[in-house]
């Protein structure tokens, strides 16, 4: 009888020892697998230089795009400068070597040959359709025209500020602007924008939601339109979508690597939407209208002072993203 009890106790103790040994063996094997896996992951991360992107992604409709830039932090010596000018400037100068001449003059101000790029555009309307600013510093020359004041101010507002934009499905949804920074930006070969404000019952205020002819017209056949309506009120929109793209945009703040030089005109254009604030003229400058050679000489002479009012950056305005990023 006692022999059976001793045997049972012995078997129980041996079982405990065996189970303990098995568990320790499993633990060592799992530790080996886990540590080896982590080692491989770390090694692969170092080799591939992988970046882990979180779920908080930026709005995909941003008109900004990152681009590779080999310049250093030293001002002027290795930065790039883009100078945008209307085609009438080169037509008036009528000299095939005038850009080389300007490059040599910029060299006297500390800008190495090859660091200054000359970008030509047809006119304000054409430039408004798809402005693209790629350099560390961008200076846009706009000749003043009293008949194009609104177009010039809207273009300046677009390129002097950073915007985040989302697509708008105006056939299915009503839209409202939440605050002063919220605007609807339209670009295309011909943009006609009509709006119908709605009351709390989604009935038109002074218009019929089913009849676009009763909508209020805020823009007709324009290339660039920045629409500002009453904040906090839903609107039904009618847009010439075949020739125009509209986006719901939020102004983030100044794009400090861009400056606009107004050529001619009595006063600098005010691009402030709020009539109760002081005119927004940051990085808006003016030179007297003479000959285009005189304009370029003035820019060269004051280029470093102009740059001091700006901030270098390595992101560009690429409005192609306005059309294709959704």
From Swiss-Prot:
Residues 1-50 form the signal peptide. One of its GO terms (molecular function) is metal ion binding. Residues 165-167 are annotated as: CNP motif. It holds the Pfam family VP7. It is found in: Virion; Host endoplasmic reticulum lumen. Residues 253-255 are annotated as: GPR motif. Disulfide bonds join 82-135, 165-249, 191-244, 196-207. Its main location: virion. Ca(2+) 1 binds at residues 95, 206, 214, 216. Ca(2+) 2 binds at residues 177, 228-229, 231, 301. InterPro entries: VP7, VP7_1, VP7_2. The keyword Iron-sulfur does not apply. It comes from the Viruses. Calcium-binding protein that interacts with rotavirus cell receptors once the initial attachment by VP4 has been achieved. Rotavirus attachment and entry into the host cell probably involves multiple sequential contacts between the outer capsid proteins VP4 and VP7, and the cell receptors. Following entry into the host cell, low intracellular or intravesicular Ca(2+) concentration probably causes the calcium-stabilized VP7 trimers to dissociate from the virion. This step is probably necessary for the membrane-disrupting entry step and the release of VP4, which is locked onto the virion by VP7. Some rotavirus strains are neuraminidase-sensitive and require sialic acid to attach to the cell surface. Some rotavirus strains are integrin-dependent. Some rotavirus strains depend on ganglioside for their entry into the host cell. Hsp70 also seems to be involved in the entry of some strains. Homotrimer; disulfide-linked. 2 Ca(2+) ions bound at each subunit interface in the trimer hold the trimer together. Interacts with the intermediate capsid protein VP6. Interacts with the outer capsid protein VP5*. Belongs to the rotavirus VP7 family. This is Outer capsid glycoprotein VP7.
């Amino acid at each position: 009888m006692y022999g059976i009890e001793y045997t049972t106790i012995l078997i129980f103790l041996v079982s405990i020892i065996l189970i303990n040994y098995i568990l320790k063996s499993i633990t060592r094997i799992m530790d080996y697998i886990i540590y080896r896996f982590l080692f491989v992951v770390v090694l692969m991360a170092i080799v591939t230089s992988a970046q882990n992107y979180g779920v908080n992604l930026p709005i995909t409709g941003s008109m900004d795009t990152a681009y590779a830039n080999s310049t250093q932090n030293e001002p002027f010596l290795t930065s790039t400068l883009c100078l945008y000018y209307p085609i009438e400037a080169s037509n008036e100068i009528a000299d095939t070597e005038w850009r080389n001449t300007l490059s040599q003059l910029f060299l006297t101000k500390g800008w190495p040959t090859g660091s200054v790029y000359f970008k030509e555009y047809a006119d304000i309307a054409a430039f408004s359709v798809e402005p693209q600013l790629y350099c560390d510093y961008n200076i846009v020359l706009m000749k003043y025209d009293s008949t194009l004041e609104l177009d010039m101010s809207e273009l300046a507002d677009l390129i002097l500020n950073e915007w985040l934009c989302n697509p708008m499905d105006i056939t299915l949804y009503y839209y409202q602007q939440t605050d002063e920074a919220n605007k609807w930006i339209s670009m295309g070969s011909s943009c006609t924008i009509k709006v119908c404000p709605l009351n709390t019952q989604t009935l038109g205020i002074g218009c019929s939601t089913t009849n676009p002819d009763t909508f209020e017209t805020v823009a007709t056949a324009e290339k660039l339109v920045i629409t500002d309506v009453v904040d906090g009120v839903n609107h039904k929109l009618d847009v010439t979508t075949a020739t125009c793209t509209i986006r719901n945009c939020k102004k983030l703040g100044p794009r400090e690597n861009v400056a606009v030089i107004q050529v001619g005109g009595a006063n600098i254009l005010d691009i402030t939407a709020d009539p109760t604030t002081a005119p927004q003229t940051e990085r808006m400058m003016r030179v007297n209208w003479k000959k285009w050679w005189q304009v370029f000489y003035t820019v060269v002479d004051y280029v470093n002072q102009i740059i001091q009012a700006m901030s270098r950056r390595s992101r560009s305005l690429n409005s192609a993203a306005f059309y294709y990023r959704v």
